[in-house]
């Protein structure tokens, strides 16, 4: 159950970094359209972060959380994400990606005590085909809600 008093705490993750791409555009569009007054929004910066995007997110009143590279320091990234979720008592994790490697964020959410874990698919293919196939059965069990940018992305 989400917190009744105070602001809801939401962490948003782009698995490809905060760069000029479709995922970041969707995240920014959502943040710009939402009433953020009843939420504390944390946006994870990993892999790469364009400074102008970081500034846009901060100008909306959101917090940027710097974490190790998801690509090169995956375990360290996952541990720090889990700790942050637990310490901040995050209500919702909304992770954007292209494959079942979103398992990393969904597992961090579960282990961190986050009740609402949203996996958001942005594509119908991925670069990590082997990891995707291996992680997919676990992935299906970890998220509580799933979004997609289109019908094909949702079916994939």
Task: Tell what function each PLM region has.
Residues 1-156:
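Membrane-interface segments of envelope glycosyltransferases acting on lipid-linked substrates or membrane lipids
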């Amino acid at each position: 159950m989400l917190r009744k008093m105070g602001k809801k705490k939401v962490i948003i993750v782009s698995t490809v970094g905060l760069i000029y791409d479709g995922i970041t555009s969707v995240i920014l569009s959502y943040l710009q359209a939402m009433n953020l007054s009843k939420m504390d929004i944390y946006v994870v910066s990993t892999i790469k972060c364009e400074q102008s995007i970081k500034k846009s997110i901060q100008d909306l009143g959101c917090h940027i959380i710097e974490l190790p590279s998801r690509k090169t320091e995956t375990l360290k990234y996952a541990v720090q994400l889990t700790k942050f979720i637990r310490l901040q008592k995050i209500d919702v994790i909304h992770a954007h990606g292209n494959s079942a490697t979103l398992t990393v964020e969904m597992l961090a959410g579960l282990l961190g005590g986050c009740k609402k874990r949203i996996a958001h698919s942005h594509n119908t293919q991925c670069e990590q085909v082997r990891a995707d196939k291996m992680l997919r059965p676990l992935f299906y069990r970890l998220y509580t809600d799933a979004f997609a940018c289109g019908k094909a992305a949702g079916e994939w």
